[in-house]
């Protein structure tokens, strides 16, 4: 439900927001980077989403309807995103769906994203941040993991609009062209993001 009971050896240190939400350390990194407090409603876990849906069902808030994983769990995710945006009076909302595309843990969040794009096609943009390894013994950047990530997203009904290609080195033009072609994007929508000394 929250990060307070997670094993820090497996999940990293617990970060507590100013309003008391126990979450993972990524939120602390985001707060430092943005130099802003991030309120509790900007963080959700699968457990907290499931718990909210179950509690509403127990309180008869679904009017006796059969409550199902789909669509009710993705609808709860969408409801929370919209509520957080409204409360913050946000011009836009940047949402990180953690994990790796294709993992079962994030499939319902991807379904929520797909449903949002379907409902608001001009207001939803998908950005895939993908790692392009450079095996030391070969010294050549590999694009296959990113190609498979895009295929997995496509299988979930999502086509990324932008790919941010993370790597130890900058991506060259031939690989950029290859990724654009094989991932159904224009070259300008494939962005190289090599490691740097400081992100500030």
What do these predicted regions represent?
Residues 1-200:
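Flexible phosphate-sensing "switch/lid" loops adjacent to ATP/NTP-binding sites
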């Amino acid at each position: 439900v929250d990060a307070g009971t997670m094993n820090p050896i497996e999940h990293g240190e617990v970060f507590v927001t100013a309003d008391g939400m126990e979450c993972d350390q990524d939120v602390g990194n985001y707060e430092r980077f943005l130099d802003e407090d991030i309120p509790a409603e900007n963080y959700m876990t699968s457990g907290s989403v499931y718990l909210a849906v179950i509690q509403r069902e127990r309180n008869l808030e679904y009017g006796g309807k059969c409550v199902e994983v789909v669509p009710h769990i993705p609808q709860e995710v969408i409801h929370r995103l919209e509520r957080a945006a409204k409360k913050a009076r946000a011009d836009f909302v940047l949402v990180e769906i953690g994990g790796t595309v294709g993992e079962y843990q994030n499939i319902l969040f991807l379904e929520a994203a797909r449903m949002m794009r379907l409902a608001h096609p001009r207001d939803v943009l998908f950005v895939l941040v993908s790692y392009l390894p450079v095996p030391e013994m070969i010294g050549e950047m590999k694009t296959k993991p990113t190609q498979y990530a895009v295929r997995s997203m496509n299988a979930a009904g999502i086509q990324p609009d932008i790919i941010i290609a993370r790597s130890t080195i900058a991506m060259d033009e031939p690989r950029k062209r290859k990724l654009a072609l094989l991932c159904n994007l224009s070259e300008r929508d494939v962005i190289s993001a090599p490691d740097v000394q400081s992100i500030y």
